[in-house]
Regions:
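Short, solvent-exposed helix-helix connector turns and helix-capping sites enriched
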Residues: 49-53, 63-65, 258, 319, ...
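P-loop NTPase motor domains
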Residues: 11-15, 19-20, 24, 171, ...
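Short alpha-helix boundary/capping motifs
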Residues: 46-48, 52, 385, 484, ...
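Basic- and hydrophobic-enriched, low-structure N-terminal and domain-boundary segments
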Residues: 1-12, 17-188, 192-195, 238-242, ...
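A residue-identity detector for tryptophan
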Residues: 14-17, 31, 57, 74, ...
């Protein structure tokens, strides 16, 4: 009796699983991602929530289903129809076997399938879980099953790993300090579904750049409950901030009081141009010479108490006397020689170098930015010194190009401080530093991002970069763009991308799959026949990738099979929404 009851429950749970799959197929055109082994779990959840049948399914599928009432009605109808269909097939099969006395499958001569006149044909396409590795066809295992992603599963956000989303109702997190790349157009959930949750769940120090005020406003109070929070917003783009906090000042002159420091900060300011030249040697020449000119100017200003406004004036007016006098008083021959080499160039060449240097410090020509450089409260060494402090850099969208050298220099300083501390202690930062570079191609484009991504983990830096599409990466880094992409261990591709470069590249990464095409023929005399053919096609064609439903993403992670996952908008998660709302409950 108990065995019969168990079998009945299993049969009912399987019918409910089948009905859910048919319903998602009807509403989205795709089969559900819930494994059949979880069918009993669906039955238990339905019993626990009889009035809210949607709660039985994971969020990824729940969003694709109709309302609770419609879902319940459809489940009842489809479950009943499934039961009737299975009963009819079982009866029909037993009836045919009784009448023929032979198995239902019949093969013709040579192993080919036979088909009688007036026969009915049914076709089914089934994906095979074996790869293809012949010719130019890449080996592919198809979409990941839950068991394939077991090493990435976590029961809750760890605090030192980036939660990527959910798969089959389970959280997936990147391995510790493995770099994450997020690609998607505006409104695809990059910020709300990954960047903000990552910041709210991180327990160590943080550096975040963004053009969106909501990233700061949603995380500021919670991060303040963990440690000191600073934000750099020289143009006041984020508006009033909770708690009446004021923006912190930053000046490159704070690091230019020594000649090595001046050379370093000049290199950081000019690096954004090197990142954007796409490998053009001519542009590299002019920016290298602009860096050589800027270093002694910054050193002269820092050692005489001058300001960045003075540096801008020296460049605009091609001032030489003040600069040379300051450098002579500083008593560093190398700095004086560098200045004289730049100032003594042929007139047309010198004019071009000055013009290039002017574009690098153009942001400080803005009175608001210049005023914010009168003080320097941002201390990169303190940020990576073991606390859970936070530094937000907020760039207005309309000023990205002009302010990019400033933001890049700040990010470069923090990364240098992190790498130096790791080298001094002989071990990675503990706790690790989270660096979130939103709009990584334009706000703070690091010239050596490919190397930073490759080495950050070993120094205790968790890197998250956010992009509109891969065309941005290609435009910014030229021939190195594929290396930038490949050095990220985790790559998340969000919905709505229309860029051909992104679609083709990701489709190629996912590879191809084998599909078995089955055809069944049922003759008038009750005889059955079957044929099978194997076809190879792209696992995720570009058109399919473009039509990913909102809130979903494709995860490409190391050597794991690719997976379709659901993002976690912070406002849909109770714990994250609570942290974003108050930041008071730890």
């Amino acid at each position: 009796m108990a065995l019969a009851a168990t079998a009945g429950c299993l049969g009912l749970s399987w019918l409910i699983w089948l009905a859910g799959g048919l319903l998602t197929l009807l509403t989205t055109g795709r089969w559900q991602e819930v494994p059949v082994v979880q069918a009993p779990v669906l039955l238990v959840r339905l019993i626990a929530h009889p009035n809210v049948p949607l709660e039985a399914w994971p969020p990824l599928i729940r969003r694709s289903l109709p309302g609770p009432g419609a879902t319940g009605a459809w489940l009842v109808v489809l479950t009943a129809l499934g039961g009737v269909a299975i009963s009819w097939l079982a009866w029909h099969r037993s009836d045919v076997r009784r009448s023929r006395g032979v198995p239902g499958l019949r093969r013709g001569p040579g192993g080919t399938s036979s088909r009688s006149a007036g026969a009915r044909r049914f076709r089914l396409s089934v994906r095979l879980d074996r790869g293809v590795a012949s010719g130019s066809v890449s080996k592919a295992r198809g979409w990941a099953h839950p068991r394939d992603l077991r090493p990435l599963r976590v029961s809750k956000a760890p605090g030192d790993r980036i939660v990527l989303g959910t798969h089959a109702g389970r959280l997936l997190a990147a391995e510790p300090r493995h770099s994450v790349m997020v690609v998607g157009p505006t409104q695809s959930g990059k910020t709300s579904g990954l960047a903000i949750p990552a910041i709210l769940e991180w327990s160590g120090p943080l550096l975040a750049t963004s053009v969106k005020a909501d990233l700061l406003h949603a995380t500021l109070e919670w991060r303040r409950s963990l440690g000191e929070v600073q934000y750099y917003d020289p143009t006041g783009s984020v508006g009033p901030v909770a708690g009446g906090s004021r923006a912190s000042g930053w000046s490159p002159l704070a690091r230019a009081a020594t000649w090595p420091g001046a050379r370093r900060i000049a290199s950081a300011l000019c690096s954004v141009a090197r990142a954007g030249d796409g490998g053009m040697e001519d542009a590299g020449f002019w920016y290298a010479n602009a860096e050589k000119l800027l270093a002694p100017l910054l050193f002269a200003a820092a050692t005489t108490g001058a300001s960045m406004a003075d540096v801008v004036r020296w460049l605009d007016e091609e001032e030489t006397n003040e600069v040379l006098l300051a450098l002579e008083l500083a008593g560093v021959p190398e700095a004086l020689r560098a200045a004289r080499a730049s100032l003594g160039r042929e007139e047309r060449q010198r004019a071009s170098i000055y013009a290039t240097a002017e574009t690098v410090v153009a942001g400080f020509a803005d009175p608001a930015v210049s005023a914010s450089a009168e003080s320097c409260e941002i201390d990169p060494a303190a940020l990576v010194g073991g606390s859970a402090g936070s530094l937000f850099c907020c760039a207005p969208a309309r000023e990205q190009e002009r302010l990019a050298p400033v933001f890049t220099a700040i990010v470069r300083e923090v990364l240098d401080a992190a790498f130096e501390r790791a080298a001094a202690t002989g071990r990675p930062l503990d706790p690790p530093l989270l660096v979130v570079l939103d709009e990584a191609a334009s706000v703070a484009p690091l010239a050596d991002l490919d190397r930073v991504v490759a080495t950050a983990a070993g120094h205790g830096v968790q890197l998250v970069t956010v992009w509109q599409d891969l065309a941005q990466v290609e435009s910014r880094y030229g021939g190195r763009w594929a290396t930038v992409v490949n050095n990220h261990r985790a790559k998340l591709v969000c919905s709505g991308i229309a860029d051909p470069v992104t679609l083709q590249h990701v489709s190629g990464l996912l590879g191809e799959e084998e599909r078995a095409e089955h055809s069944w023929t049922v003759g008038d005399d009750g005889r059955h026949s079957r044929t099978e053919a194997v076809t190879v096609r792209a696992l995720a064609p570009p058109g399919w990738l473009r039509q990913l439903p909102p809130g979903e993403a494709v995860l490409v992670y190391g050597s794991f099979p690719p997976a379709r996952i659901a993002l976690r908008p912070f406002f849909d998660d109770r714990e994250l929404a609570s942290r974003a709302a108050s930041g008071s409950d730890r």
